């Protein structure tokens, strides 16, 4: 996330920014192809979870707000979005489902948008896989996305109905990084690990006391999810 992107404010800065982004993209992805798009100021990053089956049906499973980021990479996600209105949710959900149907999409996927301060939304990309932040969707609609993608692959049809949140969930990504060194990776030994628990708390992680975080991979080592009746309660649980 965030690689090969540059904001250009002045025409005279264009060539240097283009060359820099091309070099970064080539190094990161082995592909330096570039394109230009409108820069959306004060955006929110809101994505729609969808699922499609082998029989021409698709539905959406609500949105996730992923606007809290560093270096264009997600840190905190929540659902439902505090910025969302029922009208915007319906419009974005309809657009996401339409996109899935247009390519006969099978499986779970995420259609990602930027939303400006006037609630105009712009398509960014579609992730044709399970997302890091999928647990918050599972928690608020009681829907197992991993199970669903296996069933869809096995030829089981979906109902085709859209799902809407009954609860509020927040996910914090737990990263082995040093915030005092511009979030530089911080590999090493976890000497002691004590994870939180209780009602409305979910921890997804592979680490344990004595685990050594390697320097070779992404810095994320866990996800902490809180679920509650309201956003305020979910935030309070996360603070605790």
PLM segments and residue spans:
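ATP-dependent carboxylate activation and anion-phosphoryl transfer catalytic cores
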Residues: 1, 7-240
């Amino acid at each position: 996330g965030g690689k090969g992107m540059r904001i250009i404010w002045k025409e005279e800065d264009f060539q240097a920014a283009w060359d820099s982004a091309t070099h970064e993209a080539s190094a990161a992805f082995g592909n330096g192809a570039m394109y230009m798009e409108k820069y959306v100021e004060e955006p929110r990053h809101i994505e729609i979870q969808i699922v499609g089956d082998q029989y021409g049906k698709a539905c959406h499973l609500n949105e996730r707000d992923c606007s809290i980021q560093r270096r264009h990479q997600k840190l905190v996600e929540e659902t439902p979005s505090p910025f969302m209105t029922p009208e915007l949710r319906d419009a974005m959900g309809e657009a996401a489902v339409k996109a899935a149907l247009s390519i006969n999409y099978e499986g779970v996927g995420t259609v990602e948008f930027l939303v400006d301060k006037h609630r105009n939304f712009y398509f960014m990309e579609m992730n044709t896989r399970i997302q890091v932040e999928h647990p918050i969707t599972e928690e608020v609609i009681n829907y197992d996305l991993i199970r669903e993608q296996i069933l869809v692959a096995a030829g089981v049809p979906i109902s085709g109905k859209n799902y809407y949140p009954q609860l509020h969930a927040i996910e914090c990504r737990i990263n082995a990084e040093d915030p005092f060194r511009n979030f530089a990776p911080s590999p090493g030994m976890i000497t002691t690990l004590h994870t939180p628990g209780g009602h409305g708390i979910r921890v997804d992680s592979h680490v344990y006391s004595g685990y050594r975080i390697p320097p070779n991979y992404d810095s994320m080592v866990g996800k902490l999810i809180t679920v509650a009746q309201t956003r305020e309660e979910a935030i309070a649980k996360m603070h605790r």
